[in-house]
């Protein structure tokens, strides 16, 4: 059996109107992966004979977005010679941040799109900070709309320098910077003949070289539960994605915070594991599985619980505990003060939390403190805060288990902040 190509998840980030959707559209168009719905529409128009026009396709994609259907991003897939690539989201989508954090979509790499006409803009910075907060290790930069600046190398070099400065201060080291015109198809899939001065990779070549994501098999087992089913003749079947560690048939697993809430171990033996309706003996990180647990009732566990092994159980933050976190405020209408109580979304859990302390404002690029004990924090600020959950929740310090250490803060139907858990303080 030849080894299967690695799967890589990518997100597109960048300032509004810099060309994220057009770049995605061009990638799909030039690799022959335009969504079915659009091909159907095209055929219905009875234009079978005519070739697809890129502009027409982009109009359809735009219409779908305006009707609230982003290019059904969950299914935007294509292949490169050495990778299976899934585009898991493009911002503009209201729940972009929440989706990235709650593990609906763990991104392995980000494509940062910057328009040659504008250079680095506020959202360029915000999205780059966010990529770092979310733990995205690899970035590919495209300097787009090169056709609007006559494919001028000087303009490219100037914008490239701005972006390099921004990303280096955030700790990104090696990243390709590619001059593109998504609208005309320059350097997306096909090499451009308009920029002979550039001899680096096209976007698709850069995507083909994204390092293979490592599977954290040596860490303790963590499976955030998405759903729980009770199946006749089988029993209780929790469903979730293995984030870390491995699960074998015959293992005993314990569920938290269920065990903490019920004051008794909610645990049982794993009788069987299934993935895509096929039985598995062992499940690894990234596997979406259902597993049958003996001795656990469907009413004992729910979405937001996390399964682990009893010798290294998931860490529970109780209502008498607090946790210290670094957050970036993305969108708050006024200001956040002590006492603010929004909802925390982490892995599959959602719990109300309270801001107990605002310890410091920090410079997100260096981590240096810019103000101790601020009275309030507002949109654009990065800060170190202390939060208390109003219900028990499983969280882990980001340094130990990053998959369970990232969270979004939501309120009023929007994502207010993104953050990571620094440490957990047990209360008495």
Swiss-Prot record:
Residues 181-183 are annotated as: G5. It is found in: Cytoplasm. Keywords: Cytoplasm, Elongation factor, GTP-binding, Hydrolase, Magnesium, Metal-binding, Nucleotide-binding, Protein biosynthesis. Its main location: cytoplasm. InterPro entries: EFTu-like_2, G_TR_CS, GTP-eEF1A_C, P-loop_NTPase, Small_GTP-bd, T_Tr_GTP-bd_dom, TRAFAC_GTPase_members, Transl_B-barrel_sf. Pfam families: GTP-eEF1A_C, GTP_EFTU, GTP_EFTU_D2. Gene3D superfamilies: P-loop containing nucleotide triphosphate hydrolases (3.40.50.300), Translation factors (2.40.30.10). One of its GO terms (molecular function) is translation elongation factor activity. Residues 144-147 are annotated as: G4. Mg(2+) binds at residue 21. This is Elongation factor 1-alpha. The gene is tuf.
């Amino acid at each position: 059996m030849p080894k299967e190509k690695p799967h890589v998840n990518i997100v597109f980030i960048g300032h509004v109107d810099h060309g994220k959707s057009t770049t995605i559209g061009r990638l799909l168009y030039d690799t022959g992966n335009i969504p079915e719905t659009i091909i159907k529409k095209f055929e219905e128009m009875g234009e079978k004979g005519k070739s697809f026009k890129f502009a027409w396709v982009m109009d359809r994609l735009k219409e779908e977005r305006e009707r609230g259907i982003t290019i059904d991003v969950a299914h935007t897939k294509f292949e490169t010679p050495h990778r299976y690539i899934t585009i898991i989201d493009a911002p503009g989508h209201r729940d972009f941040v929440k989706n990235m954090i709650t593990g609906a979509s763990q991104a392995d790499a980000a494509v940062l799109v910057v328009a040659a006409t504008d250079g680095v803009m506020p959202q360029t910075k915000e999205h780059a900070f966010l990529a770092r907060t979310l733990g995205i290790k690899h970035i590919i930069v495209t300097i787009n709309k090169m056709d609007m600046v006559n494919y001028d190398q000087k303009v490219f070099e100037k914008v490239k320098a701005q972006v390099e400065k921004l990303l280096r201060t955030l700790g990104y080291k090696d990243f390709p910077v590619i001059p593109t015109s998504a609208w005309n198809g320059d350097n997306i899939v096909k090499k451009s003949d308009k920029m002979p001065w550039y001899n680096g990779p096209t976007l698709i070549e850069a995507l083909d070289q994204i390092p293979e994501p490592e599977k954290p098999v040596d860490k303790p087992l963590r499976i955030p539960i998405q759903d729980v089913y009770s199946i006749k003749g089988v029993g209780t079947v929790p469903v979730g994605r293995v984030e870390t560690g491995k699960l074998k048939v015959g293992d005993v697993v314990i569920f938290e915070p269920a065990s903490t809430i019920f004051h008794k171990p909610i645990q049982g033996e794993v009788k069987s594991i299934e993935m895509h309706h096929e039985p598995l003996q062992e499940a690894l990180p990234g596997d979406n599985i259902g597993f049958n647990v003996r001795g656990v009732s469907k009413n004992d566990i729910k979405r937001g619980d996390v399964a682990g092994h009893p010798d290294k159980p998931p860490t529970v933050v109780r209502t008498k505990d607090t946790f210290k976190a670094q957050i970036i405020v993305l969108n708050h209408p006024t200001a956040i003060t002590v006492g603010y109580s929004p909802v925390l979304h982490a892995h599959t859990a959602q719990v109300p939390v309270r801001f107990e302390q605002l310890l410091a404002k920090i410079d997100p690029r260096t981590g240096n403190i810019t103000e101790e004990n601020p009275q309030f924090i507002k949109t654009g600020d990065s800060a170190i805060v202390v939060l208390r959950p109003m219900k028990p929740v499983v969280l882990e310090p980001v340094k130990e288990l990053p998959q369970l250490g990232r969270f979004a803060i939501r309120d009023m139907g929007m994502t207010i902040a993104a953050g990571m858990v620094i440490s957990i303080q047990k209360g008495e």
